Amino acid sequence: MYRHLSEGIEDHREQEQKVENAANIQDDNQLTVEQAIANLQGEDLGLRVYAAWWLGRFRVDAPEAIDVLIQALEDEDDRTNVGGYPLRRNAARALGKLGEKRAVPALIKALECSDFYVREAAAQSLEMLGDSSSIPRLIELLNDQVPGTLPAPEPPQLTQPFDAIIEALGTLGASDAIPIIQEFLEHTVPRIQYAAARAMYQLTSESTAGYNQYGDRLVQALAQDDLQLRRAVLSDLGAIGYLPAAEAIADTLAENSLKLISLKGLLEKQFQPTKPEDLSPGAIKVMQLMDALL
């Protein structure tokens, strides 16, 4: 157990050191799009990892940037001592931010990577890109039916990034995945339980009996002790726009900035392309709660 934890920390520190070294060479104000694209194709691994992060951070959606990021998903040069692929991770994360659907096939392929965190980043980016063609492979990954994948290098050594996969399936409307997602409502890891509740709310029809139970379960989770989990639940409630959670969100022991983001998600769900005077009472209440947090 402790060996896996040490490996995970070592893997993370090795990646951070590469990015830090690159940042010391070229800061954000000096780096241009052309230079970042060139760096991503160069030989300096630190500069390559940093360039992939930079292109995503600044939403550089030039065709050339998309091309080199897709190519980076198959990189074999940048590997940590414990087998991770830092460049692939950053490339996968960046592609989700750039909104280019032609990255979808490469990201689906990345779900087969042995590196747990590449698979996690690929699932998150496929969710952001919103392409349903990724659903079958995501379901296979959720069922742990993709060969050659390795578990997370630190406790609890999850075999797959279940929360990222489940959230992607919920956002993509993968109703075929409901039976398997339901099983994760009782997972031993709380954040995976919450991801399952979020997805079940998204995938269940409003006319179904007990529809609100999944949103209510997330509201109840706002009262638990772990700040990191409360932050995750705030994100989940904002993502599904669960209006009954508004006051609980505002009262949660967490940063106001995160509560405002969550409430913004609720508000966006309520907004209709109508005149301001046609706003629902629920939307008005959310706006009042947001004002109080500012």
From Swiss-Prot:
* Ribosomal protein as UniProt keyword: no
**Pfam families linked:** HEAT_2, HEAT_PBS
Q: Which keywords has UniProt assigned to this entry?
A: Antenna complex, Lyase, Phycobilisome
InterPro entries, sorted: ARM-like, ARM-type_fold, PBS_lyase_HEAT
Keyword Lyase attributed:
yes
**EC number(s) recorded for this UniProt protein:** 4.-.-.-
Offer a single GO CC term for the protein.
Answer: phycobilisome
Tell me, what is one Gene Ontology molecular-function annotation carried by this entry? Answer: oxidoreductase activity
What is the recorded function of this protein according to its Swiss-Prot or TrEMBL entry? Answer: Required for the chromophorylation of the CpcA gene product.
Q: How does it assemble?
A: CpcE and CpcF associate to form a lyase.
The entry's family comment says: Belongs to the CpcE/RpcE/PecE family.
Put simply, this protein is called Phycocyanobilin lyase subunit alpha
